[in-house]
Regions:
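The feature captures the conserved acid-bearing segment of alpha/beta-hydrolase catalytic domains
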Residues: 185, 191-249, 253
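Primarily recognizes the serine-hydrolase "nucleophile elbow" in alpha/beta-hydrolase
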Residues: 142-209
C-alpha cells in the first residue's frame, strides 16, 4: 500500500487578534494547558510597526508564568518560509515547555508565515550572507516580541528563556548578546546559519566572528544541543561554532545529542519530548527555573486501523504518540493512507490528509475517509477524490 505524508500546510485565513486570548474551539487543546493562536503587534527598535504570527501554550490559569520565547528555523526556499511555515511546526516544543510551567510562545520572525516584513536573509547571498546584520534584524524582532508578550497578565515580566533551532538558535544567541533584563537562559537547538551540505558554509569565518562577538557580550547562560547526525551542522562544525562563542568566557554548555532519524538537525520540532527534555531540565534547574511537570502528557489509546500494512501501522503508531497540534490521519478500505502534521487548523489537517490519501488510490476505488483528527477517532466521512 502506498502513502504520502503531508508535513506542512499552505496559508489560509487570518488568525485571531492578539487581544483575543480565549482559546478558539476549533483549535486543539491539551488538558491543563491553554492554547491560543495570535497575531502579535510589535514596535521595532527603529519605531516601525510589525505584525508577527504566533501562538501561546500556557498553564490553564492566569498566574504570571516564565516566558519561553521559541522561534523558527529557515527552510531551503523563501517560498516555503513565507507560504508554508506556520507556528504549529514547533508545537511539540511549546507543549513541552508549557507543561513544565512556562507560557510558551512560538513567534515566527519577520518574513516567515503570516508575519510582516522581510526575512533576515533578504538582500544577502551565499557570497555575502551578512551574518551579523541578520542577527541584528532578528534581535530587534525578538526583543520587540518579548516586550509585547510581557504585557500580558499570564506572562512574567522578570523570567524568560530564549529557545530556537537552526537559524532561530543563531537568532536567540544574537538576542542574548543584548542581555535583555529578566532573560535567564538561552537554549540553542542545532543553531547556525549558512549551511550548504554539512561540509561547506556560506562565509564560515563571518559566522564564527559573529558568534565570538555574541559570546563576548552576553552574560546569560546558554545550553547548546546538537545531534550526532545533524546534516547541516555536523559535530565538527558545531564544535567550531561553540569554540568561537566560548572564546572569551561565555557561560555556555555543549551537549552532544544522539542521532535522530535521518537528519538530527530537526530534532527540536520532530523528536518526542523524552528525546531532549532531560538535558534541558537539568540546565533549567541549574538556573533556578521551572523544570518539573505541572500537566501530564495525554495518554492516547487510538486503535490501529486493521487495513494498514506494516508501513502504515508504523506511521499510525508514530502519529498516535506525537504531541503536535493539528494533525490528521486518513485511510481507505484498501489500506492507502495519508497523514498531516503541522497544519494551522484541524480543518486544514483533515483536508491535507484526505488529499494525500486520495492521491495514492487506484482509479475506481472507494474514497478515503478521515480516521482521526488530533487524538480522536472521528465518524467515517467518505470523500471521493
Amino acid at each position: 500500500m502506498r502513502a504520502v505524508i503531508a508535513l506542512a500546510m499552505m496559508l489560509s485565513g487570518a488568525l485571531p487578534a492578539w487581544a483575543d486570548n480565549s482559546p478558539a474551539p476549533e483549535n486543539q487543546q491539551i488538558a491543563g494547558l491553554i492554547r491560543t493562536p495570535l497575531m502579535l503587534p510589535v514596535t521595532l527598535a527603529n519605531g516601525q510597526p510589525a505584525l508577527l504570527e504566533a501562538f501561546v501554550t500556557r498553564p490553564a490559569n492566569n498566574d504570571p508564568a516564565p516566558v519561553a520565547l521559541i522561534t523558527n528555523g529557515t527552510a531551503d526556499t523563501a517560498s516555503f518560509d513565507r507560504f508554508v511555515m506556520n507556528p504549529n511546526r514547533y508545537a511539540s516544543t511549546a507543549i513541552a515547555f508549557a507543561r513544565h510551567g512556562y507560557a510558551a510562545v512560538v513567534v515566527l520572525r519577520q518574513g516567515y508565515g503570516q508575519s510582516s516584513g522581510a526575512a533576515e536573509y533578504a538582500g544577502g547571498s551565499c557570497a555575502q550572507p551578512h551574518h551579523q546584520l541578520a542577527g541584528e534584524r532578528d534581535r530587534d524582532t525578538l526583543l520587540a516580541a518579548l516586550k509585547a508578550i510581557r504585557q500580558q497578565p499570564w506572562a512574567s515580566p522578570k523570567q524568560a528563556v530564549l529557545v530556537g533551532m537552526s537559524s532561530g538558535g543563531f537568532a536567540m544567541l544574537a538576542t542574548g548578546a543584548a542581555n535583555p533584563p529578566g532573560v535567564q537562559a538561552i537554549i540553542n537547538f542545532d543553531g547556525g546559519r549558512g549551511a550548504l551540505d554539512g561540509k561547506s558554509f556560506c562565509d564560515q569565518p563571518g559566522l564564527l566572528k559573529a558568534l565570538t562577538d555574541y559570546g563576548k557580550r552576553t552574560t546569560i547562560p546558554s545550553l547548546w544541543l546538537y545531534a550526532a547526525n545533524d546534516r547541516a551542522f555536523p559535530p565538527a562544525a558545531a564544535k567550531a561554532m561553540f569554540s568561537a562563542y566560548q572564546k572569551d568566557g561565555a557561560p555556555v554548555k555543549f551537549v552532544a545529542m544522539p542521532a535522530f532519524g535521518e537528519n538530527g538537525h530537526t530534532f527540536m520540532d520532530s523528536a518526542p519530548e523524552a528525546f531532549w527534555w532531560k538535558p534541558v531540565a537539568n540546565f533549567l534547574q541549574q538556573q533556578a527555573l521551572p523544570y518539573q511537570p505541572i500537566a501530564e502528557l495525554p495518554q492516547t489509546q487510538l486503535p490501529v486501523p486493521s487495513v494498514l500494512n506494516d508501513e502504515g501501522r508504523k506511521a499510525f503508531q508514530e502519529y498516535a504518540a506525537s504531541q503536535r497540534y493539528e494533525k490528521a490521519f486518513a485511510i481507505d478500505a484498501q489500506g492507502d493512507w495519508g497523514v498531516s502534521y503541522w497544519a494551522r487548523t484541524r480543518d486544514e489537517a483533515a483536508e491535507s490528509a484526505l488529499g494525500y490519501c486520495a492521491k495514492q488510490q487506484e482509479a475506481g476505488k472507494a474514497g478515503c475517509h478521515l480516521y482521526t483528527i488530533n487524538n480522536e477517532v472521528v465518524p467515517e466521512q467518505t470523500v471521493q477524490r
